[in-house]
Amino acid sequence: LGNMHLAEKHNNIALSLSPSFQWALHLRSIILTDQHKFKAAEDLLIQGIMDDPDNPVSLMSLGVVYWKWGRKEQAQNQLLKLLHRSHFEYIKGDIISRFYAAIGDNEKTIQWIKEMNNRKEMSFLILHNHPWLKSFQKSEDFIKIYKNAGIFEELFNSNF
């Protein structure tokens, strides 16, 4: 995440203003997980899910916490919940692609990034900035998706 102190400071402000804000909870879970405070991240996200049970971001975040905690079966259950829900409700592709990126499934990550582009999701334009996707930026498949979308040069300033 870079400057952890600054990230925590800003995240605490966001959560103080809106304790159930899904992106603030997601970022807080990343901070806690990076600090190996898995139980705290789990508790935070379970409360977030109880407060907003329809929130797919908290489900994804909890699955990633479980994965990084070594609780693979629980992580896979969270992923299955998201995939099941995606059959009868709209779950943004960035949520699923970030989950796959965090658990190291490169093929599925690329598949869902392509799906985001096909769906013309706005989050496609900013996904490359997420810390879990940084390792994909030099991937041939990743570069091809953004070049085919006609936005590679604008997003990456020809740094490749």
Predicted regions and their residues:
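Alpha-helical protein-protein interaction modules
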Residues: L1-F160
